[in-house]
Amino acid sequence: MSEMIVKVKEPIKQEYDLVQKGQVIFTYFHFASSERLTQAMVDSKAVCIAYETVEDPDGSLPLLTPMSEVAGRMAIQQGAKYLEMAQGGHGVLLGGVPGVDPGTVVVIGGGVVGVNAAKMACGVGAKVYMMDMNLD
């Protein structure tokens, strides 16, 4: 038995029964999104350390920030893909072309994910609006 398991992604269903009492597992668990995963880890009696909850003394989340940056940037790429007619979209090109206005992107939330989504959308030439409750 391994005493410690270090992963990037959360354990998949096929791995649940392999987790044993007392093992320490470091990974991005995202427990809020999977009741089944949460219950499996509770039942295993393993020590689960979720990267996304590790805090610096100032309260920042140093292990969540890089993944959030990637998520924000990927959101624009995925959204752009689904604007293509081949994907059932309306054939909108986010950056536009000469004579055609660029697409409009509304980003809800100005946290790490939202800011990176806005940067990516601006980078491809979209018209970008950001909405957030915090004016800072």
Enumerate the language-model features and the residues they cover.
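Glycine-rich phosphate/diphosphate-binding loop of Rossmann-like nucleotide-binding domains
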Residues: 88-136
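Glycine/serine-rich phosphate-binding loop and adjoining beta1-alpha1 elements at the start
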Residues: 13-104
